[in-house]
């Protein structure tokens, strides 16, 4: 008589309640945390800034309700696409994550989630986010706009390998470029019929640059939390480039972040945004740099959380700008 041997993880998956599966799918996409918020910030900012600009210059061709509807669509599309990217990252890194204290309990790394389940979930999310973009952008410039973030998402986990470091490539570069791309979606949500794709790129570039250097800054601090485990496995990250000068490196990046804000704000000519964005970010970034301690890697997590709060505040500031412009037009 032949007895069939069943893998413990496979047996666990077979007996697992549906509720546990759903929760693991939520966790693998980071929908239980604020990580995926990173993907929606640039798109929401871009939509609100473009909406405020159009309300000021062409008030008869748009409305506050239209701008807000585009914000919702852009947020959902970016957030869901980011969730798919998280699945891809965890699938590629599942063996590495199993050896790192902070990530060993992730659904794929721990074996609770089967790879086929993860891939099916990834496809569902990509299809949903693409459908939302088609709706928001009315079918124009969708595929060409999706190419950069799709390539960045696919490459990101591989940029953490030692081989990438040999070519001077760090994962934060790719993550920054990917996080900046939704700014094009946001601009297209408002000016899709008026602007060519090149016009959309040109108008979005200042915000894309800001998001790129901002992501490089806070993700360098965030990934520094894993410096001990990452060093053992030779994981590539921008803090490796900084070495013992990690604090000085973060100061330099903060300077670039703040220097790029005026370029973003110039077309709006808004005193409110200068105070609520430039002013608040200057104070916030200074506070982060004071509290970051290179000898305590956990303070990198504090920098990450502070930047999420700054980003949420900036959504509020941009929303107020839209309302101020609308009130002025009444």
Curated annotation (Swiss-Prot):
What is the protein name for this chain? Polyprenyl transferase olcH
Query: Where exactly are the transmembrane stretches of this chain?
Result: 35-55, 71-91, 116-136, 142-159, 166-186, 200-220, 248-268, 270-290, 308-328
In terms of Pfam families, this protein maps to: UbiA
- Give the location in the cell: Membrane
Required cofactors, per record? Mg(2+)
Q: How the protein sits in the membrane?
A: Multi-pass membrane protein
Single Gene Ontology MF annotation = transferase activity, transferring alkyl or aryl (other than methyl) groups
Null mutant phenotype reads: Abolishes the production of 15-deoxyoxalicine B.
EC number per UniProt: 2.5.1.-
Query: Transmembrane helix: is it a keyword of this entry?
Result: yes
Q: What else is known?
A: The 15-deoxyoxalicine B cluster is a rare cluster that contains its own geranylgeranyl pyrophosphate synthase (olcC), in contrast to other related clusters which rely on a FPP/GGPP synthase localized outside of the cluster.
Q: Which GO terms describe its cellular component?
A: plasma membrane
By which gene is this protein encoded?
olcH
Instruction: Give the GO terms filed under biological process for this record.
Output: terpenoid biosynthetic process
Part of which pathway? Secondary metabolite biosynthesis; terpenoid biosynthesis
């Amino acid at each position: 008589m032949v007895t069939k041997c069943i893998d413990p993880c496979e047996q666990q998956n077979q007996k697992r309640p549906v509720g546990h599966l759903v929760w693991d799918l939520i966790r693998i996409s980071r929908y239980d945390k604020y990580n995926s918020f990173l993907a929606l910030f640039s798109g929401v900012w871009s939509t609100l800034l473009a909406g405020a600009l159009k309300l000021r210059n062409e008030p008869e061709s748009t409305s506050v309700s239209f701008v807000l509807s585009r914000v919702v669509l852009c947020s959902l599309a970016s957030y869901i696409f980011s969730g798919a990217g998280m699945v891809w990252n965890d699938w590629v890194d599942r063996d590495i994550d199993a050896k790192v204290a902070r990530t060993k309990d992730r659904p794929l790394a721990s074996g609770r989630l089967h790879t086929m389940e993860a891939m099916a979930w990834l496809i569902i999310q990509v299809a949903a986010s693409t459908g939302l973009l088609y709706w928001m952008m009315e079918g124009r410039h969708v595929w060409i706009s999706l190419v950069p973030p799709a390539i960045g998402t696919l490459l990101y986990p591989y940029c953490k390998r030692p081989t990438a470091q040999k070519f001077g490539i760090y994962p934060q570069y790719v993550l920054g470029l990917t996080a900046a791309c939704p700014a094009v979606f946001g601009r297209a949500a408002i000016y899709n019929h008026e602007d060519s794709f090149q016009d959309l790129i040109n108008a979005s570039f200042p915000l894309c640059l800001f998001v790129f250097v901002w992501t490089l800054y806070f993700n360098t601090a965030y990934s520094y939390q894993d410096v001990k485990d990452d060093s053992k496995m030779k994981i590539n990250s921008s803090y490796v480039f900084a070495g013992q000068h990690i604090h000085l490196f973060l100061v330099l990046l903060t300077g670039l972040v703040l220097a790029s804000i005026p370029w973003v704000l110039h077309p709006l000519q808004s005193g409110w945004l200068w105070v609520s964005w430039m002013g608040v970010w200057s104070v916030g970034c200074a506070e982060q740099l004071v509290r970051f301690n290179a000898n305590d890697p956990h303070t990198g997590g504090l920098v990450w959380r502070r930047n999420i709060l700054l980003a949420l505040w900036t959504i509020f500031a941009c929303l107020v700008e839209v309302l101020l412009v609308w009130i002025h037009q009444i």
